[in-house]
Amino acid sequence: DETPIQVLKEEGRRPQSKSYVWLVRTGDNGGIPIILYNYTPTRAGSHAAAFLAGADPGYYLMVDGYKGYNKVPEAQRCCCWAHIRRYWLRAIPKGHEKDYTHPAVQGFLYCNKLFEYERSYREKGLSLKQIYHRRLKDQKPVIEAFLSWLDQLHPESGDRLIKAINYSNGCRPFMMNYLKDGACSLSNNLSENSIRPLVVGRKNWLFCDTPAGADASMKIYSMIETAKANELDPLKYLSFLLEHRPGAEMSDEELEQFAPWSKLAQ
């Protein structure tokens, strides 16, 4: 996910220029929670590609409909069904929430059915392998029906309805990628929740003075939010780091001892 920030002293840019923070985090599949923030001066998709450089080829990338993510190579892009559902929800006219003949309501219900299945899997405590097989049985037919239904829509009016159709069509190439692995999420909600502390903080600190300050701030955010995600007290974790002072001269194995999920940090 990405969100704008203001950095006052960027070379060759006005103080009012819009800069960006990118967030990348691990999914909710039971692995180690890692949350990383990265400052860049623009929203160009090449920044996302650089941020993710070095990841194993073929990894799954859960994002919204921003086309800049198409520049990320070697990733299997997955679309966020929460974003798609939100477009259909916004397209429902006031007072028509129960009008099941209205296309916006129908589109919303198609999307919502996927989330109902996901909720049932969690309630039943299914394994990732079981989720993979159940998704193919339950959810793939829903998506296929949704796409066939979408092909039949040709509205002549209704800006929000047209936006919902266009947004959904833009996500077509990625709609079923999450079905390939039970560890994939259905939505990008986890990233949106993780970027919220930065958004709330931005309302208080307003801007960063320099690019170096913005970069340092995002490193601090990364440490604090990853510590919180690993159920650590962030103040105690930062004190732990300052006491031990891990440095660049250490090997990767030595540095990992100071990660929030390490036994030493826990």
Whereabouts are the PLM-identified features?
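Catalytic center-proximal scaffold of phosphoryl-transfer enzymes
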Residues: E2-Q266
